[in-house]
């Protein structure tokens, strides 16, 4: 049984190109060592086209042999260790990537993306669990909605074990290059199968990797070789375009550098990109405007719920200079009538979420204006999801959401199913603890959709979730999509000198 599983995994490695045929005996022996087995007999390889099932079987063997505890985190640590034995060394990966890059950047990234899935760094079986649908908004177009189920939730054993582990500062964070090949521990994921491509960005050492959770096609992360904090300045725009010029089929964007409106990791400078067209990228300029001193740069306010200024030019240097002017102006801009305050009590509030891309030979830079001011009424942020939408989304609106992809919490999968069942029975939503938070919203959905039945209920709820997400994006917009909001937006643009 064990030998058949090991043989199947080795054959998988050869079939996918992770290892060469002549590596068969060597790899088999490494796997035997990992499973504390000194013997081997040639058995028929277990038939399994499903890598996850094969690895589950090997984890079962490890549990039986007392090598690991039977918990989700222990199993993840162990199966990553096994896949690390099949994953090519970083130098081999880099060499192949560079050779393919000479043929075309797209060929290189296609190969690397496949490698990251084949070696199980991207756990395809888990990514496939994510729920995805499209909400067609009448104003803003096709909005992507996802309920994220691929991020593993800590099991109780792992939580208990993590409390006993001595605090470690290595690697300094989840993004650091020191994660490449790292064995992991109960409170830090294993990364033996993790690879990142060294690249030069703005004359500095950076790395290209893929997100293990792939929220969209070829979801990549570009991170600094040094553990330095996020910062939005002129060099940010230069780095974004430096990357896009090297990989013109990818967009690249940065989270904002302030809390509330920033991403989950502000301590390590990094960007996110990929081979995907978001709703925001498809959005048209609602009105064109002129930036003083940059009359040759096409500029306009985007038809989008978040307040976005789009800049276009064939020369990225012009966009870098123009964006720097906009950023400096926005950092110090106050408009009390529009409730825009550059700072309060010495705390800065204004920043930008920038996204760079190349479209048919023309470079684009979208500048989403952000502000993280809080008030007594909105302690989590005025331009943050408001309380009435927290039953769907209360987390920060980061780069991915700004572009039009909702990453919603996993709890919604079960909550929406329960909600559908209760609503179809005309039950009392407020009396069911797990979905009571949705009661007011559910009542409104019922009023808006008297036609709701078993056949259409799921679709209706999905579309209504999409509507809520657009409302959340509107909350994040510092200038609302109203005549008054657009007037205030124009006032800012005209102030840029």
Locations of regions flagged by a protein language model:
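Active-site microenvironments that recognize anionic phosphate/pyrophosphate groups
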Residues: 1-222, 226-229, 303-305, 320, ...
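Catalytic or ion-translocation cores adjacent to nucleophile or general acid/base/metal-coordination motifs
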Residues: 235, 244-267, 273-334
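Helical scaffold of the NTase/Pol beta-like nucleotidyltransferase catalytic core
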Residues: 193-195, 225-252
């Amino acid at each position: 049984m064990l030998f058949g599983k090991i043989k199947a995994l080795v054959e998988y490695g050869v079939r996918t190109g992770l290892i060469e045929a002549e590596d068969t005996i060597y790899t088999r022996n490494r796997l035997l060592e990992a499973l504390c087995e000194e013997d081997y007999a040639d058995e028929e390889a277990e038939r399994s086209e499903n890598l996850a099932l094969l690895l589950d079987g090997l984890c079962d063997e490890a549990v039986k042999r007392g090598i690991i505890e039977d918990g989700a985190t222990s199993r993840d640590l162990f199966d990553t260790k096994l896949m690390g034995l099949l994953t090519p060394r970083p130098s081999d990966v880099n060499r192949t990537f560079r050779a393919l890059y000479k043929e075309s950047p797209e060929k290189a990234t296609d190969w690397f993306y496949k490698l990251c899935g084949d070696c199980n760094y991207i756990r395809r079986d888990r990514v496939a669990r994510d729920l995805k649908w499209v909400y067609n908004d009448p104003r803003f177009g096709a909005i992507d909605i996802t309920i994220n189920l691929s991020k593993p939730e800590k099991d109780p054993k792992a939580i208990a074990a993590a409390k006993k582990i001595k605090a470690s500062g290595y690697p300094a964070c989840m993004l650091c290059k020191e994660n490449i090949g790292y064995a992991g521990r109960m409170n830090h994921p294993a990364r033996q199968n993790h690879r990142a491509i060294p690249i030069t960005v703005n004359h500095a050492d950076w790395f290209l990797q893929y997100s293990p959770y792939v929220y969209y096609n070829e979801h990549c992360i570009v991170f600094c070789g040094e553990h330095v904090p996020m910062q939005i300045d002129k060099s940010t725009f230069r780095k974004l375009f430096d990357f896009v010029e090297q990989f013109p089929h990818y967009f690249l964007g940065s989270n904002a550098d302030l809390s509330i409106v920033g991403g989950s990791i502000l301590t390590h400078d990094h960007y996110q990109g990929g081979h995907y067209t978001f709703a925001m990228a498809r959005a048209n300029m609602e009105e064109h405007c002129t930036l003083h001193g940059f009359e040759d740069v096409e500029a306009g306010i985007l038809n989008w719920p978040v307040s976005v200024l789009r800049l276009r030019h064939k020369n990225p240097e012009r966009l870098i200079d123009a964006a720097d002017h906009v950023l400096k102006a926005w950092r110090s801009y106050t408009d009390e009538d529009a409730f825009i305050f550059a700072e309060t009590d010495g705390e800065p509030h204004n920043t930008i979420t920038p996204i760079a891309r190349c479209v048919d030979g023309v470079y684009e830079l979208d500048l989403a204006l952000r502000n993280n001011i809080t008030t007594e009424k909105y302690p989590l942020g005025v331009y943050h999801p408001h309380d009435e939408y927290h039953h769907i989304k209360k987390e920060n609106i980061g780069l991915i959401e700004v572009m039009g992809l909702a990453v919603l919490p996993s709890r919604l999968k079960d909550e929406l199913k329960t909600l559908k069942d209760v609503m179809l029975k005309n039950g009392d939503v407020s009396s069911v603890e797990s979905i009571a938070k949705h009661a007011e919203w559910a009542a409104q959905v019922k009023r808006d959709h008297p036609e709701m039945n078993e056949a259409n209920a799921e679709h209706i709820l999905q579309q209504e979730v999409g509507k809520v997400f657009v409302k959340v994006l509107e909350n994040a917009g510092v200038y609302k999509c109203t005549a008054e909001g657009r007037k205030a937006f124009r006032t800012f643009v005209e102030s840029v000198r």
